[in-house]
């Protein structure tokens, strides 16, 4: 289709040759499979589903004098993006939340109840930092050419194309498109920049309920003291860009 578009624009000098088209269809070597890539970025960068976990545990009981209730919960929301945690960077998208709630009611007298309520949650959000923000990953996946570059250079490439400058770096290498690194979705995911955000909330109440049936049946008075706190802060952040490489096939 690209050739058809170029012919319509009379750009005959820039047509892709039949030999090159055959290499895209059936690469003649594993090195040519990198030189003539056919990458489905959506399949390579995303899973077909995202994980979600919810767990909760409750306990309650009491006596004539005291009643109690306690609840703890955990929630996890994953992502369809294929991230990685290799001990150096964590490019996964996820959100974990831990929450708790406790209620204790004391029957101080037949007409007086003092209640203590405490609850809160802690949330941890982890995500990579593509150059164009949170929406940038979709931009790279749907905007990158399938035939411009592979996802990365496997370590075996050094067997066929030795690196005279860094011969000791025998590992998979991120790809730079001729010194321009904004086009490769895999590079954006794995470049090394990620951030972890933590938010915490705490709620506490002390409630006094006094029945006043001696004045009027059903009459009562209630007093309440509440305290709420909220914190949001960056737990971990990296600003290091992992090196990217460009392989000259000429």
Model-derived regions, located:
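Transmembrane beta-barrel domains of bacterial outer-membrane proteins
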Residues: 83, 108, 220-222
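Membrane-embedded beta-strand positions of outer-membrane beta-barrel proteins
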Residues: 70, 116, 206, 221-223
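Solvent-exposed, glycine/polar-rich loop segments of beta-barrel outer-membrane systems
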Residues: 239-249
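Flexible loop and strand-edge segments within Gram-negative outer membrane beta-barrel domains
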Residues: 33-73, 77-80, 91-182, 195-197, ...
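Conserved small-residue
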Residues: 1-31, 130-137
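Outer-membrane beta-barrel architecture
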Residues: 67, 113, 199-201, 216-222
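Individual transmembrane alpha-helix segments
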Residues: 187-194
């Amino acid at each position: 289709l690209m050739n058809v578009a170029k012919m319509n624009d009379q750009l005959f000098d820039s047509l892709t040759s039949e030999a090159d088209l055959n290499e895209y269809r059936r690469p003649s070597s594993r090195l040519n499979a990198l030189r003539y890539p056919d990458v489905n970025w959506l399949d390579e960068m995303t899973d077909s589903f995202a994980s979600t976990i919810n767990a909760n545990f409750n306990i309650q009981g009491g006596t004539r004098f005291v009643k109690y209730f306690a609840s703890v919960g955990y929630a996890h929301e994953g992502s369809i993006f294929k991230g990685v945690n290799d001990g150096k960077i964590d490019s996964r998208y996820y959100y974990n939340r831990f929450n708790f709630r406790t209620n204790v009611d004391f029957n101080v007298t037949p007409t007086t109840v003092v209640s203590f309520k405490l609850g809160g949650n802690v949330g941890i959000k982890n995500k990579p930092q593509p150059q164009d923000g949170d929406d940038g990953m979709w931009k790279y996946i749907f905007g990158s050419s399938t035939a411009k570059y592979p996802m990365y250079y496997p370590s075996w490439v050094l067997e066929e194309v030795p690196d005279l400058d860094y011969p000791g770096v025998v590992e998979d290498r991120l790809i730079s498109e001729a010194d321009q690194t904004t086009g490769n979705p895999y590079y954006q995911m794995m470049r090394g920049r990620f951030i972890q955000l933590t938010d915490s909330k705490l709620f506490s109440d002390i409630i006094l309920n006094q029945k006043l049936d001696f004045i009027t049946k059903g009459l009562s008075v209630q007093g309440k003291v509440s305290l709420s706190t909220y914190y949001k802060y960056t737990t971990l952040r990296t600003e290091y860009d992992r090196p990217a490489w460009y392989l000259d096939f000429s």
